Amino acid sequence: MNKGSIFKMDNDFEKRKAEAGRIREKYPDRIPVIVEKAEKSEVPNIDKKKYLVPSDLTVGQFVYVIRKRIKLSAEKAIFIFVDNVLPPTGELMSSVYEDKKDEDGFLYITYSGENTFGASSI
């Protein structure tokens, strides 16, 4: 897992918090998500880190979005982690956001080709 989010390192807390606040105000039915690859993962890098995710999207549907963005073939596995935990694929992104959003207002998701942290769920 990343020692720290690159997005967090590149943008100070106040800037991130203000941006997430603006996003939530302008798009109340969307969730501001930052997606980053796990440090030692062999899967491809994602072309874009910031996403505005519909609240009613499931974790499984968002995994599909990530798969498409990194052009991962169907036979390769991908795992996403929120706070080093694998969220249930059927859970709504809005629920994960409410439980696990960062104090800056973003939800941070790390993806990997390996199940690095075991199979525990949120």
UniProtKB/Swiss-Prot annotation:
Residues 119-122 form a propeptide. The record marks G118, A119 as: Cleavage. It is a lipid-anchor. One of its GO terms (cellular component) is membrane. It comes from the Eukaryota. Interacts with ATG4. Interacts with SH3P2. Interacts with ATG1A and ATG11. Binds to ATG1A and ATG11 on autophagic vesicles. InterPro entries: Atg8-like (IPR004241), Ubiquitin-like_domsf (IPR029071). This is Autophagy-related protein 8e. Ubiquitin-like modifier involved in autophagosomes formation. May mediate the delivery of the autophagosomes to the vacuole via the microtubule cytoskeleton. The lineage of its organism: Eukaryota, Viridiplantae, Streptophyta, Embryophyta, Tracheophyta. It comes from Arabidopsis thaliana. GO terms for biological process: autophagy; cellular response to starvation; protein transport; response to ethanol. It holds the Pfam family ATG8. It is found in: Cytoplasmic vesicle, Autophagosome membrane; Vacuole membrane; Cytoplasm, Cytoskeleton. A lipid is attached at G118 (Phosphatidylethanolamine amidated glycine). The C-terminal 4 residues are removed by ATG4 to expose Gly-118 at the C-terminus. This Gly-118 forms then a thioester bond with the 'Cys-558' of ATG7 (E1-like activating enzyme) before being transferred to the 'Cys-258' of ATG3 (the specific E2 conjugating enzyme), in order to be finally amidated with phosphatidylethanolamine. This lipid modification anchors ATG8 to autophagosomes. Keywords: Autophagy, Cytoplasm, Cytoplasmic vesicle, Cytoskeleton, Lipoprotein, Membrane, Microtubule, Protein transport, Transport, Ubl conjugation pathway, Vacuole. Constitutively expressed. Belongs to the ATG8 family.
